[in-house]
Regions:
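N-terminal secretory/targeting leader peptides
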Residues: 1-54, 63, 71-264
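Conserved glycine-rich "GG(E/T)P / GGGxP" loop and the immediately following alpha-helix
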Residues: 68
């Protein structure tokens, strides 16, 4: 049985249920797993992937297997990773194309890496529940937020932040997780079949999301969204110290970073 649209709770809650044997499988953002295994921060580091094609190559390789195995101590196993595409800035009052223009309060996901990233880029990172973002931008508590085009349109946040600025700063993965006891209860043949299906689903999901991004950009344009191309190298340069910091935190993050670079 599949329960979409947060019927069983938000992502933090569903992963908790998965670790407590109350839920067999769940799909959650990398930042949620990062709260259990901090080394996962390397997968959500700004500008760590050169392109969506590069990210897909990394996810389809076996080079993340050692990192994925570290979640077992917390009661779940990561089977595969996907991506909705690059996250970009969107703002309420004006376009942002350079770091100098980003002296704004921007909603980010609630991880230390994401907050540090936004601060490094020139803004002020504010962690906030997604359900509060629309009204916070509307009232001026926030100047904007950041997300992929699909989520931006689905949440109709273009109504309060019509400037969509292509910074491409993050490609946060979503990971498919299974309860460790459930996985271990399966026969070896069934385990291999499940892992094979999970691996094959990566290409399907990347292709599907590419089609969705194209459709959603068209929808956004119809709604009057103003697209701007940002000075990506300038933002990337400001994030380099953060990239180096995350990459060199542990032997695992260093190995994963080198594996990501090797797929470029």
């Amino acid at each position: 049985e599949v329960y979409p649209d947060a019927q069983l709770g938000d992502q933090q809650q569903t992963l908790e249920q998965c670790t407590m044997d109350a839920l067999d499988m769940t799909l959650v953002a990398n930042s949620i797993i990062e709260t259990y295994v901090p080394d996962f921060a390397i997968l959500g580091t700004p500008y760590v992937y050169d392109s969506i094609e590069h990210q897909q190559k990394v996810f389809e390789s076996s080079k993340l297997d050692d990192l994925f195995a570290t979640t077992r101590d917390h009661g779940f196993v990561v089977l595969s990773a996907y991506s909705l595409g690059a996250r970009n800035l969107y703002t309420r009052d004006k376009a942002v194309t350079t770091p100098e223009e980003l002296a704004m309060k921007i909603r980010v996901m609630g991880s230390d890496t994401c907050i540090a990233m936004m601060n490094a880029m020139g803004g002020v990172g504010v962690a906030m529940a997604q359900g509060d973002v629309y009204s916070a931008i509307q009232t001026g508590t926030l100047d904007g937020a950041e997300n992929n085009i699909i989520t931006y349109v689905d949440l109709v946040q273009y109504e309060v932040a019509p400037y969509y600025n292509r910074t491409g700063h993050l490609m946060i993965p979503d990971e498919l997780c299974i309860n460790a006891k459930v996985f271990d209860s399966m026969s070896a043949e069934d385990q291999e079949a499940l892992k094979k299906c999970a691996s094959e689903s990566i290409d399907y999901m990347f292709n599907l999301c590419a089609e969705l991004r194209s459709d959603y950009e068209a929808k956004a344009a119809e709604k009057g969204v103003i697209f701007s191309d940002a000075d990506v190298p300038a933002f990337q340069a400001l994030c380099q110290d953060l990239i180096n910091d995350v990459a060199n935190r542990t032997d695992m993050t260093k190995a994963v970073y080198e594996a990501i670079v090797s797929e470029r």
